[in-house]
Amino acid sequence: MKVLLTRAKDRNQLMSEALEQLGISYIVTPLLEIKATDTTQDQNAIAHVNSADIVIFISTNAVALASQTVKLNKHKTAQFYAVGNATFHALEELGIASLAAPPDHQQTEGLLTLPELQDLSHKKIVIVRGVGGRETLAETLIQRGASVDYWETYQRVCPLIDPRTPYQWQDAGVDTIIITSGDILRNLIKIVPKELFAWLRTCHIIVPSSRVKEQALAYGLNQVTNAKAANCKAMISALGLLI
């Protein structure tokens, strides 16, 4: 087995360490780049956060960039929520208690099962996320009685990749690819040339959710496994390995 790790720069360390412990060979090629937006200094957005009853963080990037502007641990009234385990721990490192989606369902849909998010009449909610995220969470919260604002603190872009890189993956014997978001999947499909799609279809693709699995299958990828979360433990488990 040779694994390709594709998360944004500096986000592949845990998987790298886990694979090294298991003696599994891997290559790191970030297929996503995170850039802060001008809204990190948007006083209107900051005011919404400061007056919110509930603040929901979609990712660790959302936590990192928001915390550069707002003293989140000084917020006296809001309840904080994290979609995934990594985001939960990012808040925890700032001294912020939060609620997270269930361990076996760490996506938007899992977060929406929490009893605390069922009756939201007159609640003011801010969702901290990247530009162009899904609307499912906000739409459902509004249906449950909340008013919802976004604070889009970053954007996800496809990094510049040397056209020779996909050929190097094939030559190196890559047969397993870790995909932790729909954006990374789209970027993978974008940069792999048509003549390498036969190879790509032979690779075992590990994805974080049923939604991304459906996207992968729609692209014609054949061997796709849903890890049900984007964290290291879930991905390793999906590989059929134990840390």
Model-derived features with residue positions:
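Signature of uroporphyrinogen-III synthase
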Residues: 1-243
